[in-house]
Amino acid sequence: MPRLLAPLLALSLLLLASGAQASYITRTLNKPVPGGVAVVDLGPATSAPSARFDGKPVLVVKEQDNWLAIVGIPLTQKPGTAVLNQDGRTLPFSVGSKKYPEQRITLKNTRQVNPNPADLKRIDRELAEQIKAYRSFSPALPSNLILDKPVNGPLSSKFGVRRFFNGEERNP
């Protein structure tokens, strides 16, 4: 038994040391699944590198001596290897799978599930405004990467739930 103790202790210390090397941002935000966030280490540099995922710019922040790319992963992303492009080089990262909890809602007003043509016209107009906002990108650092709870009070439902309205899945 004492002969097993030394290798077990060495392995434990190695595992602790490897976990300690991950940055606070990585430990807190890195949940690389569809609908999650990947934190990709870009390494050290004198100025902020530029990074893109799926042709779109991503937030780059500095923590200690390294730059990190904060990559939002679409819900439609297939599990497997994804690629971040950073100043001419490609950085692969793994996207895991995730089974989201489901919520099934039955609505009496079917227009809220399958809108009529007038509703669709308004929805399309509002969607165009949303897409315009989504396409804008500011390299300015946000005041807080770790989001705070928006309000105190009872939680009506968790974020990250697949919703079905009258049996039909809808985007959140």
Residue ranges and their predicted role:
Residues 26, 92-172:
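Surface-exposed, glycine-biased beta-strand/turn segments
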Residues 1-6:
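Positively charged n-region of N-terminal signal peptides that target proteins for export
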